[in-house]
Amino acid sequence: TGVNYGQLGNNLP
């Protein structure tokens, strides 16, 4: 989940 990880500030896909 790129959206969720994006909100966490992670660069994971």
Swiss-Prot record:
Keywords: Cell wall, Secreted. GO terms for cellular component: extracellular region. It is found in: Secreted, Cell wall. This is 27 kDa cell wall protein.
